[in-house]
Regions:
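Conserved core of the PLP fold type I
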Residues: 113-247, 256, 262-277, 284, ...
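Conserved glycine-rich beta-strand-loop-beta hairpin in the small C-terminal domain of fold type I
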Residues: 336, 356-367, 377-394, 401-415, ...
Length: 483
């Protein structure tokens, strides 16, 4: 119920006022006292709440990748020119979609079929195309019934976690991509179980910790792997993937692999698909077109289901996901129709290679500039298109700052950092106010590590070099400001 905010004049005796509140309580309505119950000789009823709190645990969590945009836009209104390094949208950063891809999509729009519903699990021809690609590699064999399309992987992630019993948990990497973390917390209403990605060892996962936690926590039923990783850019070698599969097999778990960036690997790094190593372990691979095509606005992703026929419990879980999907009828038809036509176009492979070469150059530019910055732990990115740097925590405190010339901008930033926020977020806000460079605090990826994530998407390499050098100089200036 909304707050009544009803004003009671001072002729109303306080005893009667209290009686009214008692009646509300008897009717099952909770009363939340207001600071203005008695003000200026007048009594306010304050706020009447619903019978009980209807918001689920986790309703106060934020998605900082987007939340930082709100802050940046307010600074833009104050005259700050913003360099957007916060979100992985290649198109927003200037990626030009090739004409041949646009022509394919334009042609599909002319087909009446693109305006119709698709089957609940996805367009038959597209699922058959994906199945052929998976089976051709010679690993686990699937059928079109093992493919389910969603309106983006955010939708797939939400469905996959919400279909799990609330007392069953998926262990996730730390740091981890925000959407997975939020989905796990919201489904269970408890903080997640995590296994560490170690920045001192090139962001390798601590597989001993993973197995120890799986062994000691019977509530863990699944393991999440993001390969290549977001936010760290770590690319899992085949050996590590096989070890994780073996852990799942030993302890009767299922696997969720987010393989959004599986075809976006460079710097000589090598990895393999989950389907190549999964064997007979129940698993889900999540893939999409947002980053690879890139077509983030299409909101099109899918699950590949492995070995549901080998585990009755896992099969029931997948059936729950599918029944939830049926309530939505289907996913958007147009991008599904485009997938086979774009991926089989003779220009597609070379187009992707050229993009990867660009990310490789930017990865090395960023690494070579940041690796020598005091107080930072930096690893070269070999997959996806993000660079993550970690502060040595001993050097951060709440007295540090960056000088900001414009008073209105400075006042706004100082107001933000006065709210007892994480120390890396404090740096990010000062960086944004002082330089206009918008990055994401690493603690937003639900880790105790303090740092920041930036993208490798800038098309102008000279501008990108300036951005990274400015960040490096700002880190040094920020650290030195409180000494």
């Amino acid at each position: 119920m909304r707050g009544l905010n009803q004003l009671w004049q001072n002729f109303l005796p306080r005893a009667l006022f209290q009686k009214i509140l008692w009646i509300f309580c008897e009717k099952g309505v909770r009363y939340k006292p207001s600071k203005s119950v008695l003000r200026g000789g007048k009594i306010y009823l304050g706020e009447v709440l619903m019978r009980f709190d209807i918001a689920r645990a986790g309703s106060g969590l934020t998605y900082e990748i987007r939340n930082i945009v709100i802050v940046a836009n307010k600074l833009r209104n104050l005259g700050v020119e913003v360099c957007w390094e916060n979100i992985g949208d290649p198109v927003q950063k200037g990626e030009k979609i090739p004409d041949w891809m646009k022509e394919i999509i334009a042609g599909i729009i002319r087909e009446d079929q693109s305006f119709a519903y698709s089957p609940t699990q996805g367009m038959n021809e597209t699922r058959e195309f994906i199945v052929e690609k998976v089976n051709r590699r010679g690993g686990v064999q699937i059928s079109p019934d093992d493919i389910i399309f969603f309106n983006g992987l955010g939708d797939a992630i939400a469905r996959s976690y919400s279909s799990i019993r609330s007392d069953a948990r998926v262990i996730v990497p730390e740091p981890t991509y925000s959407t997975h973390f939020l989905a796990e917390v919201l489904h269970a209403s408890f903080p997640p179980n995590t296994y560490r990605m170690n920045p001192y060892q090139g962001w390798q996962p601590d597989l001993k910790e993973l197995e120890q936690k799986v062994k000691s926590h019977n509530s863990i039923v699944g393991i999440l792997v993001i390969n290549p990783d977001n936010p760290t850019g770590y690319v899992y070698p085949e050996e590590h993937l096989r070890q994780i599969v073996q852990i799942a097999k030993t302890y009767d778990l299922f696997l969720i692999f987010d393989e959004t960036y599986i075809n976006m690997v460079y710097n000589g790094a090598k990895t393999v698909y989950l389907s190549d190593v999964v064997g007979d372990v129940p698993a889900i691979s999540m893939k999409g077109i947002s980053k690879e095509f890139p077509w983030p606005g299409a909101r099109c992703g899918w699950m590949e289901i492995y070995n549901a026929d080998k585990d009755e419990t896992f099969a029931r879980y997948i059936d729950t996901i599918l029944k939830q999907k049926m309530s939505e009828v289907c996913s958007t038809t147009l991008p599904q129709l485009a997938i086979p036509r774009i991926m089989t176009h003779p220009e597609y492979e070379n187009y992707l290679v050229q993009r990867l070469m660009h990310y490789e150059r930017l990865s090395n530019i960023a690494y070579n500039i940041l690796k020598d910055v005091p107080c930072l732990i930096v690893n070269r990115t070999d997959g996806a298109f993000y660079m993550t740097a970690v502060f040595n925590e001993a050097f951060l405190n709440n007295r540090q700052y960056l000088p900001i010339k414009h008073e209105s901008v400075r006042n706004f930033v100082e107001h933000l950092v006065s709210q007892n926020i994480e120390l890396d977020k404090r740096f990010v806000y000062y960086l944004l106010g002082a330089t206009g460079i918008c990055v994401v605090p690493l603690t937003s990826f639900f880790t105790s590590l303090q740092g920041f994530r930036m993208t490798l998407l800038e098309k102008d390499e000279e501008k990108f070099t300036w951005i990274v050098k400015t960040i490096a100089e700002s880190v040094v200036e920020y650290i030195e400001s409180a000494r």
